[in-house]
């Protein structure tokens, strides 16, 4: 689980920068496409072992105006709004809706993408086993795996933060706060993001609001 209470930038600075995202007013829906799917992607997602969800339009993939100063290729995660941004040139970004797990609230700051994996295996932690298990000690990659189609592993100072951006086998929770996991995306969206990101890319994670999250977490 990510380290609690850790942040690489002052809370006030990161919070102020987060307010600037409110200027992303002009949006263009960018429908999902299977053009970049691998043969394994097509096979796994043709008949997934979960119900297909109707994602609210707000949390579907959009091209938006982006008023912050991160360089193109940077990822920014706004846990309060449940959005992830991939910065494009010329003041634009791709905005994806995400589900935010409790672990995702435990770390904020600036990291890099230290590792990337397609259809990753999942090794449940002891805490997850006690709280939500039992699970096998290792769950093989596939559409039933909670990590979904892709995973980005965030590193800080050369060390794994245990913070992940990954797919999901519960797309119905996109746009919500939930009780476990890090940053979850639909499998279609995380494949799209994965194909854009390069190892070493900068990831900025804004801290959650100090006042806590109204409504709490969903199980």
What are these regions (language model features)?
Residues 100-102, 168-171:
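Short, solvent-exposed aromatic-acidic interface loops
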Residues 183, 188-219:
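N-terminal targeting pre-sequences for secretion and organelle import
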Residues 58-60, 173-181:
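Short, basic/aromatic beta-hairpin or loop at an interaction surface
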Residues 18-44:
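Bacterial Sec signal peptide processing site at the extreme N-terminus
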